[in-house]
């Protein structure tokens, strides 16, 4: 708003609820932005709290259900999750419910990178691949081994809609490397910022 004067950029709730670039400097500091965004203060625009793995499964299915059976039935709901979040009970229940309710407007985007915050990779704990994790639930599944390439991603995305069953929920998996472009890889990249004003800090 300060640069353009366009009122569409003004938050009607005032500065207390307006997010500025400077607020990013308060990330994970007392009274600042939380590491996992929550529906309060300057991040009140989020529809749901974030945090525990798999936490968003039920809200995503619920949102897709509400939209499908309202005047916004053509609106798609995208849920982003890593493979760790697919291990929770609520995730299994949401996948079953999505198929049973015919939520063809629900699309999971699975970041398949094999790591969470622990040293042990998920492949040591959770067997199989995204096809194994979704197809038995009746979902349409497509993906790419090159999850950082937009052309590959879009090709896989288009495959999801080749299904004749318009009520079939969909899962798009992307094979990635956690920490790519950040120079801290796998579990070591979690909650580990580069030292402020270091060479790595400015290179990113």
Where are these regions (language model features)?
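Cofactor-binding active-site loop characterized by glycine-rich and histidine/acidic residues
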Residues: 1-101
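Short secondary-structure boundary/capping segments
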Residues: 2-6, 93-97, 122-127, 160, ...
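Catalytic cores of large soluble enzymes that bind and process phosphate-bearing ligands
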Residues: 12-19, 45-55, 86, 118-126, ...
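Hydrophobic, small-residue-rich alpha-helical packing segments that form membrane-like cores
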Residues: 56-80, 89-114, 123-136, 154-167
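Short catalytic-loop micro-motif centered on adjacent basic/acidic residues
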Residues: 79-81, 140-145
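Acidic, glycine-rich active-site loops and adjacent beta-strand->loop/helix elements
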Residues: 81-88, 111-116, 147-150, 176-178
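Structured core elements
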Residues: 107-109, 143, 171-173
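Glycine/aspartate-rich loop-and-adjacent alpha/beta segment that forms the canonical ThDP
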Residues: 132-135, 150, 154-204
């Amino acid at each position: 708003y300060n640069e353009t004067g366009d009122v569409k950029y003004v938050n009607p709730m005032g500065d207390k609820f307006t997010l500025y670039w400077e607020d990013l400097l308060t990330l994970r500091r007392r009274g600042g932005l939380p590491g996992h965004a929550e529906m309060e203060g300057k991040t009140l625009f989020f529809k749901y709290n974030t945090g525990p793995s798999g936490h968003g499964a039920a809200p995503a299915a619920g949102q897709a259900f509400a939209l499908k059976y309202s005047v916004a039935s053509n609106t798609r709901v995208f849920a982003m999750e890593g493979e760790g979040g697919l291990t929770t009970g609520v995730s299994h229940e949401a996948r079953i419910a999505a198929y049973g309710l015919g939520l063809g407007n629900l699309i999971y985007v699975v970041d398949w990178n094999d790591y969470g915050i622990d040293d042990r990779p998920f492949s040591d704990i959770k067997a199989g691949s995204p096809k194994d994790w979704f197809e038995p639930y009746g979902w349409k599944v497509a993906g790419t081994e090159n999850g950082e390439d937009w052309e590959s991603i879009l090709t896989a995305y288009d495959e999801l809609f080749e299904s004749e069953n318009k009520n079939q929920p969909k899962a798009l998996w992307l094979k990635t490397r956690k920490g790519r472009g950040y120079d801290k890889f796998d579990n070591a990249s979690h909650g580990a910022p580069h030292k402020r004003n270091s060479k790595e800090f400015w290179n990113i």
